[in-house]
Amino acid sequence: LYVSGKATALVRQLDGRGLGVRDLSGEIGRASAIKMVYASSTKGAFTLFAAVAVMAELTGLRDELFQELSESQPNTLASIERMLPRIPLDANRWIFEMDEIASTYESLGVTSHFHKGAGDIMQLANRTPLATRTRETAIHDLALTDVLRHYVDAINQNEGQTEKQKPTR
């Protein structure tokens, strides 16, 4: 738990009692800011990996991509395998978080486009049947190919679909 501001002493007493408390000291808002910076990093990476995997599926290059990643970037492949099925479980609330992060980036003069795109990926994930589940009811042994099929089906079922979005195979 991150805390900041002048009145953190009471919360700091919880440190080590089932809770890890990190005092960022300084002005109020630093704790919220680190949460946003961290979330923009983690969820931004998850959504980039999701977009890459879906693109590979749509272009018929999934196997080739996964082979290349297994040889050159095994940690990236492991992240895709771990996170792609999980994104839909929280996507509904993460959509708004991506909007908030994008606005913060924009207010700081940094491009907001990446996290606007991350929000789009969250919306796509939220349209899959996987989004009807929770972390407790998730299907944990679902094959990645099946997960990707759900994402592609959500694209294909989206109203106003353009020719560019249709699978090439």
Model-assigned labels for residue ranges:
Residues L1-K43:
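Rossmann-fold dinucleotide-binding core
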